């Protein structure tokens, strides 16, 4: 093996994108493929983990509403522990790790322990969601700037968000703001006094994507009738989401949840073909690969939890 080809100890802080596996960057894919250990978030598409080697260790460190979560301090400690005992560690996060992904805390820990690292950007939810609406976050003559903000603060504090961008005809993208939506919409009404268009995109780019549109004065009522656990939602406020097409709001289509059974390398190609047309996919290679115990256990749990509408056997 040449010096350039040798794999050195390193931690990659990788953005997995918004959910559709076809939106994973090539760099992120290469990091996953060479990882010895993957620490992954709840929002990561399960199929993306299956791009890894069968002998890679998977560790779930996700923060999930309504359930116990892994504290950030524990995640930081795991990064150090695994980096000191393995060659390549991937910290796999939904979206872009540098946008509300607490990447600075993990970087500070790695620097403190002199562990080499690299941040690998991913497609963030706001831009992915707008692509699904057939719109841009900015629009000439309508919105010339964009603000990303979060509705979820440290220690669950309910801090005010900066509405300056709306006062200046910009676009506001609110991450993790569904629980605080009534309060946030009320703040816009009181401080700005304009009934802006609003769109909320749940599970953007995934097969179970769901879009709800309205205005600042109506959107809370419209999402109140939805099931409690719709999945992650990004809220877009501003004139860029005015007059959305009916096809965007109700796309129709017969999307399936597909289980592909077979050896991983071969199954990945088939799974990608289904994912590219909007279907949810998972690989079951437990009988074909010498899997790391964490992989076998995780795949078995996913299969038990998911309802598949189609199974494809490659044997």
Please name every model-derived segment:
Residues 2-64, 164, 273-278, 286, ...:
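Glycine-rich, flexible N-terminal cofactor/catalytic loop recognition
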Residues 9-11, 87-89, 153-314:
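A contiguous loop/helix-start segment that scaffolds small-molecule binding in enzyme catalytic cores
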Residues 18-19, 43-45, 61-68, 123-125, ...:
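Short, acidic/turn-prone active-site loops that include or flank metal/cofactor-
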Residues 36-38, 58, 136, 172, ...:
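Short, well-ordered beta-strand core segments
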Residues 43-46, 50-82, 99, 302-307, ...:
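A cross-family phosphate/adenosyl-ligand binding-site feature
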Residues 82-85, 102-104:
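Ligand-binding beta-strand-loop-alpha-helix segment within the catalytic cores
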Residues 92:
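Ligand-binding face of N-terminal immunoglobulin V-set domains in extracellular IgSF glycoproteins
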Residues 96-168, 286-300, 308-314:
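Class I SAM-dependent methyltransferase SAM-binding "motif I" and its flanking Rossmann-like core
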């Amino acid at each position: 093996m040449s010096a350039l080809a040798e794999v050195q100890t390193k931690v990659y802080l990788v953005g997995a994108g918004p959910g559709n596996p076809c939106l994973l960057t090539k760099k992120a894919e290469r990091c996953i493929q060479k990882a010895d250990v993957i620490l992954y978030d709840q929002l990561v598409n399960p199929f993306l983990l299956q791009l890894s080697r069968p002998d890679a260790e998977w560790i779930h460190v996700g923060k999930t509403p309504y359930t116990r979560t892994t504290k950030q301090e524990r995640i930081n400690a795991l990064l150090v522990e695994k980096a000191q005992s393995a060659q390549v560690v991937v910290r796999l996060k939904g979206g872009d790790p540098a946008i509300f992904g607490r990447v600075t805390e993990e970087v500070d820990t790695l620097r403190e322990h002199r562990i080499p690292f690299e941040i690998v950007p991913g497609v963030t939810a706001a831009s992915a969601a707008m692509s699904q609406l057939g719109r841009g976050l900015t629009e000439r003559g309508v919105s010339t700037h964009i603000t990303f903000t979060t509705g979820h603060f440290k220690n669950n504090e309910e801090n005010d968000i900066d509405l300056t961008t709306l006062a200046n005809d910009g676009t506001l993208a609110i991450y993790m703001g569904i629980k605080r939506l009534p309060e946030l919409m009320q703040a816009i009404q009181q401080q700005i006094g304009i009934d802006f268009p609003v769109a909320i995109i749940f599970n953007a780019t995934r097969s179970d994507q769901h879009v709800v549109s309205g205005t600042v004065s109506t959107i809370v009522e419209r999402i109140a009738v939805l099931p409690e656990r719709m999945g992650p939602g990004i809220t877009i406020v501003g004139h860029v989401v005015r007059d959305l097409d009916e096809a965007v709001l109700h796309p129709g289509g017969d999307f399936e949840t597909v289980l592909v059974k077979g050896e991983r390398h071969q199954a990945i190609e088939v799974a990608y073909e289904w994912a590219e047309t909007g279907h949810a996919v998972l690989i079951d290679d437990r009988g074909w690969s010498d899997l790391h115990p964490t992989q076998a256990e995780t795949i078995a749990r996913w299969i038990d939890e998911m309802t598949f509408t189609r199974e494809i056997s490659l044997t």
